[in-house]
Amino acid sequence: MWGLGDVWQNEAVYARLGCPLDEQVPVQGEELHFEHGHMLSRPDVTLIYVFLEQLQPQGWGAYVDTYQPSDLDSDPNVIVPTPASSGPRLVQPTGRFGKLWRENAWLREKLGWAVTLIPEAEAQPITSFTGAAQDFERGVLFWNGNVCFVLRTDDMSWDLY
């Protein structure tokens, strides 16, 4: 069976991340895509990872997930722009991702709007996943059930495996 160790054994990954700090842990998370990036939740450590430009310094960040069920799910005063007819449908992010997006103007500007690839879909494009995470001396391996994100803390760059 495939695991995070398979990615870590890649010489380039190992050299950048260093040694594991602990065992890999299972993660039941959520993911949301935006016009210019995406967010992944990591509930085991109450973080939201935000991904901007792949392979670029400062291309990702980790934010504390402060969302509570009593928080507003969305802001009724936010007006979603009409996208180009050929583009994905734009939506206001909701829940934990929406709270972070609404409270951080810099992230709103960098990420743009949440998107759904199914134009007629009315539901939020948030997807749940079963994955795994492992912390290292200089980064994190995070699997969302589909791909493995290699998060490097020396320059805050990331890559996919």
Spans of features found by a protein language model:
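Extended, compositionally biased repeat/scaffold regions that form elongated interaction surfaces
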Residues: 1-161
